[in-house]
């Protein structure tokens, strides 16, 4: 069973994800339909970043997954050599 701390951390992560999803959805889907002179545009980055930020995040995710897999494989290989 999850402890109180786990539940609070989980709730925080869900809330953060919801905020990011809402912001990104408004930025990418709704903002192009609003007049470019409207005051709401100052709260969002330029549209070029709408592609660049997720692309960079995806690359970082793949990089960290690759590093983790490489680390685990090398560690298992070293453990196998020690037992022989």
UniProtKB/Swiss-Prot annotation:
GO biological process, one term: dolichol phosphate mannose biosynthetic process
Keywords annotated in UniProt: Endoplasmic reticulum, Membrane, Transmembrane, Transmembrane helix
Residue ranges of the TM segments: 11-31, 49-69
Name this protein carries in UniProt: Dolichol phosphate-mannose biosynthesis regulatory protein
InterPro entries: DPM2
GO cellular component terms given for this protein: dolichol-phosphate-mannose synthase complex; glycosylphosphatidylinositol-N-acetylglucosaminyltransferase (GPI-GnT) complex
Quaternary organization: Component of the dolichol-phosphate mannose (DPM) synthase complex composed of DPM1, DPM2 and DPM3; in the complex interacts directly with DPM3. Component of the glycosylphosphatidylinositol-N-acetylglucosaminyltransferase (GPI-GnT) complex composed at least by PIGA, PIGC, PIGH, PIGP, PIGQ, PIGY and DPM2. Interacts with PIGA, PIGC and PIGQ.
Similarity section: Belongs to the DPM2 family.
Topology in the lipid bilayer: Multi-pass membrane protein
Physiological role: Regulates the biosynthesis of dolichol phosphate-mannose. Regulatory subunit of the dolichol-phosphate mannose (DPM) synthase complex; essential for the ER localization and stable expression of DPM1. Part of the glycosylphosphatidylinositol-N-acetylglucosaminyltransferase (GPI-GnT) complex that catalyzes the transfer of N-acetylglucosamine from UDP-N-acetylglucosamine to phosphatidylinositol and participates in the first step of GPI biosynthesis. May act by regulating the GPI-GNT complex.
Pfam families in UniProt: DPM2
Annotated localization: Endoplasmic reticulum membrane
Disulphide bridges: none
Gene Ontology molecular-function annotations: enzyme regulator activity
Upper classification of the organism: Eukaryota, Metazoa, Chordata, Craniata, Vertebrata
Pathway of action: Protein modification; protein glycosylation
